[in-house]
Amino acid sequence: RQMCIRDRTKRYLTFEKARFGEDRVLATFDVSEDVEDTLVPAFVIQPIVENAVRHGMGDDDALRIDVTVHQDGEDAILIAVADNGVGMDEGTAARLFDERSARPDASSPQGGGAGVAMHNISERIHRFYGPHSYTRVESAPGKGTKVLLHLDLSESIFDIQE
């Protein structure tokens, strides 16, 4: 199922705010008008926001999640999901896309290996938006995490406008 990015993310965050409290999960959206009606599959954005809440939230401070979506060239969009969470080191960020790290781990409390969601998202983006699309993670311990998705709409297998 496809839904515009802002609506999909707001809907998911409603559940997280109910779970942790309105004051613990804060979100901003900066979606340029020329892409605000662009549709993306639910299983691309939602797991990134879910990871921000699950892995980025500290013990005391509110987690801020900023979602920006802008045109990136003529036929592409750039989606950035940034948080002010606990962050991660370069090695951990690199392992997010390592197929060996993405294998399910029954002993994990979350039921998966490190990076299962990011590995799956990266594969979906290539499959659904073509070889010129990519996923990148920028993070540092104590500085939060930013996930960037570059989606080549000219290669999309979806009807991308409402």
Regions of interest found by a model, annotated:
Residues 2-138, 146-150:
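Two-component histidine phosphotransfer core
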Residues 152-157:
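Two-component histidine kinase transmitter core
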Residues 160-162:
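Intrinsically disordered, low-complexity acidic/proline-/asparagine-rich linker or regulatory tail/stalk regions
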